[in-house]
UniProtKB/Swiss-Prot annotation:
InterPro entries: Dxylulose-5-P_synthase, THDP-binding, Transketo_C/PFOR_II, Transketolase-like_Pyr-bd, Transketolase_BS, Transketolase_C, Transketolase_CS. One of its GO terms (biological process) is thiamine biosynthetic process. It catalyses: D-glyceraldehyde 3-phosphate + pyruvate + H(+) = 1-deoxy-D-xylulose 5-phosphate + CO2. Homodimer. Its EC number is 2.2.1.7. Pathway: Metabolic intermediate biosynthesis; 1-deoxy-D-xylulose 5-phosphate biosynthesis; 1-deoxy-D-xylulose 5-phosphate from D-glyceraldehyde 3-phosphate and pyruvate: step 1/1. Mg(2+) binds at residues 148, 177. Thiamine diphosphate binds at residues 76, 117-119, 149-150, 177, 284, 366. This is 1-deoxy-D-xylulose-5-phosphate synthase. CDD domains: TPP_DXS, TPP_PYR_DXS_TK_like. Catalyzes the acyloin condensation reaction between C atoms 2 and 3 of pyruvate and glyceraldehyde 3-phosphate to yield 1-deoxy-D-xylulose-5-phosphate (DXP). Belongs to the transketolase family. DXPS subfamily. Transmembrane segments: none annotated. It comes from Azoarcus sp. (strain BH72).
């Protein structure tokens, strides 16, 4: 007998809506159990998905999806949504090569109304959908589901500010699993939310507004009385000021609270705001006890749980950065560490513990993080911003206008440069070398191994100007970082192998495969180290002695390091052919990093084939 008899009968939200309401609790239980079993086999995001089981069921039960639009902020909490919308069997390939994505994708399902993965975009997107429906006279609802972390970002508040004046049928659901608002969650607030979302209350409210609106002092008094009364129970005043009708907070794991409240809200017009309280890891004691550990997981035994401890493997680049930052901070009190809500992922846990007064988590606010760092640099401190490549994209103006233009000594420690694997197109660091190389005053470095990463970080903090050190996700080549730390000469690369006819110019993580290609072709191999400034003397030397220069980078080939090499070679009197290899002009899907590199021709076989196509071995 199947352990999921109710779940297996649900192939779409229509099947869910045909389910007896009294059976929904069992559906939730089976969905949660299936999530634990499935994610333990594939890896993925677990805690956040366990925390949204009941909310997901209630939304698809009450609203007429996909005609009513649900936009999930960030999107890593949508596994339950995928299961209920016909993708239960596809979960076995979640985040794997050729399988379904770990985030919503419009091309994957009509129920994925908007692609997400970066935070704080849901309200803007849902508002656009709601306004389009309003202007076309369509009676549908747009719902944005956003977490309390994502709600802290400026873009979310920009959208709230705009939405309050739009009079569109938008529902914003705040999925609150961090704030300490436990006292208001109970029978009183459940009743209050149900009453406040009901037709009787809202009809009376509209009548009262019309009557009292004819007497301005009375209207203001009524508003203040209502605001005061609600303020004693719920933290909704802020959202009311934006022009929303606020309901909650209610228990996000209580279907008997969620469903009637959503049913009432669905009947209302204009912008509505529902505040639900959930718990990450709900229903799986190990994840409840440590939701951070179970936030993003690899395959594990769900009965025994994730086994922590030293793996004894190679250092990851994130660990190299973490060790360096603690070492340099111990020697220099001017060092401060900044992260936009990525303490664990960016390697700042130990720094935060050892130097709490010099550690700043600014929340999901990449723009603020960079300008905050610029302000610190103005006052003589040495800020180090630890940030993923994909999230640095969100702060490009601040990098140019607030840091580089003023030539401020801010260090950008850019993690996850290149292809990151299972998170896919939304998280690959595919564009950073392209958008960094054109910024004046900025020094851009890409280490080839762990030791070089440590030395480059030290070089960055010694440099009196803005710097970026861009390193890949995962482990290095096993090189042990050397002591003492030494500042590298700015803009100087090195020859790692001398050969004939062909020279391979490797940037960062591509050095290892470049050396393999060099051995196969008896080619010269250069470790370029710096994307900006380029080692023009080294390039000129290679150009004078080789018929073909091959640039290899784990970055978009358009506008990347290879483009800069080709631009310089074009100024030389002796101009060999330049073959630029990198990521193609398309978004790269998810899968194992090695699979992805092979798929875009950046493994040994692919590089050799590309060279053979333009410069046959017998030439």
């Amino acid at each position: 007998m199947s352990p999921y008899p109710h779940l297996e009968r649900i192939g779409s939200p229509a099947d869910l809506r045909a389910t007896e309401r009294r059976e929904l609790a069992q559906v939730a239980s089976e969905l949660r159990a299936f999530l634990i079993e499935s994610v333990s086999k594939t890896g993925g995001h677990l805690s956040s998905n366990l925390g949204t089981v009941e909310l997901t069921i209630a939304l698809h039960y009450v609203f007429n999806t996909p005609d009513d639009r649900i936009v999930w902020d960030v999107g890593h909490q949508t596994y339950g949504h995928k299961i209920l919308t016909g993708r239960r069997e596809a979960m076995s390939g979640l985040r794997h090569w050729g399988g379904i994505s770990g985030f919503p994708r419009r091309c994957e399902s009509e129920y994925d109304t908007f692609g997400t993965a970066h935070s704080s975009t849901s309200i803007s997107a849902a508002l656009g959908m709601a306004v389009a429906a309003r202007d076309r006279g369509e009676d549908r609802r747009a719902i944005a589901v956003i977490g309390d972390g994502a709600m802290s970002a400026g873009m979310a508040f920009e959208a709230l500010n705009n939405a309050g004046d739009m009079d569109a049928n938008l529902l914003v659901i705040l999925n609150d699993n961090e704030m300490s608002i436990s006292p208001p969650v109970g029978a009183l607030t459940k009743i209050l939310a149900r009453l406040m979302s009901g037709s009787t209350y809202n009809a009376a409210r509209r009548v009262g507004e019309k009557v009292l609106g004819t007497v301005p002092p009375m209207a203001e008094l009524a508003r203040k009385v209502e605001e005061y009364a609600k303020g004693m129970i719920a933290p909704g005043t802020l959202f009311e000021e934006f022009g929303f009708h606020y309901y909650g907070p209610i228990d996000g794991h209580d279907l008997d609270a969620l469903i009637p409240t959503l049913q009432n809200i669905r009947k209302l017009k204009g912008p509505q705001f529902l505040h639900v309280i959930t718990k990450k890891g709900q229903g799986y004691k190990l994840a409840e006890a440590d939701p951070i550990l179970y936030h993003g997981v690899s395959k594990f035994d769900h009965t025994a749980g994730i086994q922590t401890g030293k793996s004894g493997g190679k250092l990851t680049y994130t660990q190299v950065f973490s060790d360096w930052l603690c070492d340099i901070a111990a020697a220099d009190p001017r060092i401060v560490g900044i992260t936009p809500a990525m303490r664990e992922g960016s390697g700042l846990v130990e720094f935060a513990q050892r130097f709490p007064d010099r550690y700043y988590d600014v929340g999901i606010a990449e723009q603020h993080a960079l300008t905050f760092a610029a302000g610190l640099a103005c006052e003589g401190l040495k800020p180090v911003v630890a940030i993923y490549s994909t999230f640095l994209q969100r702060a490009y103006d601040q990098l140019i206008h607030d840091i580089a233009l003023q030539n401020l000594p801010v260090v950008l420690a850019i993690d996850r440069g290149g292809l990151v694997g299972a998170d896919g197109a939304t998280h690959h660091g595919a564009f950073d070398l392209s958008f960094l190389a054109c910024v004046p005053n900025l020094v851009v470095m890409a280490p080839a191994d762990e030791n070089e990463c440590r030395q480059m970080l030290y070089t960055a903090v010694c440099h009196d100007g803005p710097t970026a050190v861009r390193y890949p996700r995962g482990g290095g080549s096993g090189v042990v970082p050397l002591e003492p730390m030494t500042a590298l000469p700015i803009g100087k690369g090195e020859i790692r192998r001398h050969g004939t006819r062909i020279a391979v110019l490797a940037f960062g993580s591509m050095l290892g495969v470049a050396l393999e290609v060099g051995e196969a072709l008896d080619a010269s191999v250069a470790n370029m180290r710096f994307v900006k400034p380029l080692d023009e003397a080294l390039i000129a030397e290679l150009a004078a002695n080789h018929a073909l220069l091959v640039t290899v980078e784990e970055n978009a080939v358009i506008g990347g390091a290879g483009s800069e090499v080709a631009r310089f070679v074009d100024t030389l009197p002796q101009r060999p052919r330049v073959l630029r290899l990198g990521l193609p002009d398309r978004f790269i899907d998810h899968g194992d990093q090695a699979q992805l590199l092979a798929s875009v021709g950046l493994d040994k076989t692919g590089i050799l084939a590309a060279i053979e196509a333009v410069y046959p071995h017998n030439s």
